[in-house]
Amino acid sequence: MQWTDGKIRCHWVSPTNTTYLRYHDEEWGRPVHDDQLLFEMLILENFQAGLTWECVLNKREAFRRAFDEFDLRKVASYSEEKLTALQADSGIIRNRLKIRAAVVNAQVFQKIQQEWGSFDRYLWHWTDEKSIQEVDKVSSPLSDAISKDLKKRGMKFVGTVIIYAYLQAVGVINSHESGCFLNPLQQ
């Protein structure tokens, strides 16, 4: 479907949700190499488990406020009082297990940074620093392998489907559909 701006986009983009539209046009599938943003997207994807990405994306600013702008050091050291406050924050998804997982995942993220020099190096080494183009999948051998490794390291809510969505979000996998103006084969 061609939009009023003359562009063709992936079928899942809602023309009525400008947040979702901007996300598709400006973020999704674009390679991310900044550890701060890689951490933010990982935590947001963790909260997506069992929900729609649109639901999480619509709460993104509230998540940023609640999670101290996704400051890795702060999140990794959250106290019980902070966790209780997060569970009471109606602006975010208040799942107790996901909130606690954010702290554990922040701690593991830090350990990976220490081991690899950055989370970026760890993540992109799986593809030799290259984006992969694939569409119409929800998991792959790549997401299986990364999911398995992250679980072994202690991360939570990092099943293969969540990791695949994460890889798409941060541009390791570009899943813009054939015809979409952001599909690399269209450019």
What are these regions (language model features)?
Residues 1-187:
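HhH-family (HhH-GPD) DNA N-glycosylase catalytic core used in base-excision repair
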